[in-house]
């Protein structure tokens, strides 16, 4: 596997879609949708999902990645992505909880305006992700193994990402459980500026899986 070509492909597949949606940004905002829209989010999420599976396959790890918007049997929460034991053959994108290795929250843009709802970063993060972390901790007790809850955003405001990363690392009890590709403010200006290089994504994934 040529890592550089995969990293370039990840960006090259997504950036043209961002530019296309950016040209229609006004229309999307008129419809009260976030910049990027669900369409763009789906394109990026599918690309990221394939990117993760390619890394897993290259290193012969015994895991598979669910399709987007998957469920864990007996759990009411819809997860953006689930990484599970490769031997499992899930039905209807529903995963056996005993086979789950990690769950992932994916955001096209991880930038949030704190003043919009007059909440602090900490309050927003707890209200947004607290229930999911409680669910993960409950599942861990039932299946008797660690399940990490990871966060990935394609673009983000740097300050917001730092707060998000600190929150996820604290609740996972380990470092490096959140990852951001691009600077959201620069992306709005049409500039492609990395927050963390694509090469660092492998380290993030291995850490999430406990395979460092």
Residue spans for each PLM region:
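Intrinsically disordered, low-complexity Ser/Thr/Pro/Gly-rich regulatory segments
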Residues: 1-212
């Amino acid at each position: 596997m040529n890592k550089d070509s995969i990293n370039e492909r990840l960006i090259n597949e997504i950036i043209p879609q961002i530019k296309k949606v950016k040209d229609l940004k006004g229309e999307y905002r008129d419809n009260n949708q976030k910049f990027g829209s669900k369409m763009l989010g789906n394109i990026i999420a599918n690309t990221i999902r394939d990117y993760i599976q390619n890394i897993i396959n290259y290193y012969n790890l015994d895991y598979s990645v669910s399709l987007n918007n998957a469920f864990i049997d007996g759990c009411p929460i819809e997860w953006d992505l689930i990484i599970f034991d490769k031997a499992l053959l899930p039905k209807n994108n529903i995963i056996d909880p005993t086979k789950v290795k990690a769950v992932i929250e994916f955001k096209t843009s991880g930038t949030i305006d704190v003043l919009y709802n007059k909440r602090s970063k900490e309050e927003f993060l707890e209200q947004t992700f607290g229930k999911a972390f409680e669910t993960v901790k409950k599942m861990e007790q039932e299946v008797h193994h660690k399940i990490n809850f990871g966060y990935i955003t394609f673009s983000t405001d740097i300050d917001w990402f730092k707060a998000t990363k600190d929150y996820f690392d604290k609740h996972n009890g380990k470092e490096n459980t959140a990852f951001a590709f691009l600077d959201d403010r620069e992306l709005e200006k049409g500039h492609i500026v990395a927050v963390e290089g694509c090469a660092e994504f492998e380290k993030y994934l291995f850490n999430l899986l406990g395979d460092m």
